[in-house]
């Protein structure tokens, strides 16, 4: 599993492109779910595929946070935002931090970048091993196949003052594979206008199958129909109290 070229090329513009995302609302909802379903008593939170650290920044006042991401570029930005926080480069299929957490999260459909079910099972096992007894796993999956709009197109504009970004996208589907084709126009003072293209490939896994994989990893699992993004839902899986 490689870090996406998009994150290497566009890490510096990532927060601008997602400026409309309500991280505060997302985080508040995640905390409510973690408190409702979690059975451990601590306050340690691991965010896998933490990106630039926006969720961790909001969790930090209440939790002792750690982040893992595959992208050096995204981690560099996260370190600027979160001085003193442990941020580790790692692959979600294989990392081992040597410690356990009360909450493990994998958000913003990062799990969808795993191309095979075997990879998904490996990642779920890694998540489970990092949970304390009674700890809770929160996974925001890629979109449920039944909600996917084939041929869907979008256009968004983002004004960062001296930097302006237009992003257009289209979606193609082949079996369980979703390809999201992005075109970026980046207008930046002193650098002119650049056009970048990138295709992101994500695997669709039916919610019922995600629950089965989490249970096979030894967790008690369910899929909530509403999550940080409603049509994606939220996998909630709890480790047994004694292991």
List each model region and its residues.
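Conserved alpha-helix/loop element of class I SAM-dependent methyltransferases that forms part
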Residues: 24-41
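Conserved class I S-adenosyl-L-methionine
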Residues: 41-49
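Class I SAM-dependent methyltransferase SAM/SAH-binding core
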Residues: 46, 53-94
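A short acidic, Gly/Pro-enriched loop at the edge of an enzyme's catalytic core
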Residues: 93-103
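A short SAM/SAH-binding and catalytic strip from SAM-dependent methyltransferases
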Residues: 102-118
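A short glycine-rich, Lys/Arg-flanked "PGG" loop and its adjoining helix->strand segment in the class I
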Residues: 121-133
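SAM-dependent methyltransferase
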Residues: 138-209
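C-terminal lobe and adjacent flexible extensions of AdoMet/dcAdoMet transferase-like proteins
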Residues: 203-243
